[in-house]
Amino acid sequence: MKRAYSPKDIAAKKWVTLPWGEKWNKPFGFPAENASWFISGASASGKSSFVMQLGKELCKYGLVLYLSYEEGVNQTFQRRMEYLKMNEAQGKFRVVVDETYEELIDRLKKPKSPKFIIVDSYQVSEWEYPDAVALMKRFPKKCFIWISQEKKSQPMGGGAIRLRYICDMKIRVVGYKAYCQGRAIGEAGSYYVVWEEGILSLIHI
């Protein structure tokens, strides 16, 4: 029989949260280090830049693995790395482009394996919803960040929609702004500025 938690049991649970600064905690609060993230956005919304900025910030708290299934390490990806000065995260940030589901599991089973795993994108990975759930259950102390394509302002595909529902942090990037729509909302009305010049350009259109 599975354990049933009492209110006292639940109140006694402790979480290690991300101790990040105001730039991040205002829009996103202080999520647990092992919280699951779901980030969606249309093409050219600033989503990729936001994900890279988040990855760089998380390097302060552990090793980050970026599964770049969608872009690989093409010229655009390289330019984004340079623009965001990802060289400052040398030794904490790793990128793989063609790792299989089984190979990822083998990597994560090793000592000192990555603490934060960014899957970009869920659709291009071609994993099924049960695969994603099984991965998070198998490695409950790790943080999985799922990046999703969109179609008509919604995550593309039924599996992505289901995955969004179960993730702790639900982020949508629109017009170079990242909004928290999930369970750990920060300050009301706040958002993360991905690219200020981009926001200004939209205002003046």
What are these model-derived regions, one by one?
Residues 32-41, 49, 53, 98-192:
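P-loop NTPase motor core
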Residues 203-205:
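Conserved small/polar residues in nucleotide/adenosyl-binding loops
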Residues 13-14, 201:
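Phosphate-handling catalytic cores of nucleic-acid transaction enzymes
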Residues 197-198:
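Glycine-rich, acidic loop segments that terminate in or are immediately followed by a histidine
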Residues 1-13:
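Charged, amphipathic alpha-helical linker segments immediately N-terminal to NTP-binding catalytic cores
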Residues 33-102:
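Conserved P-loop
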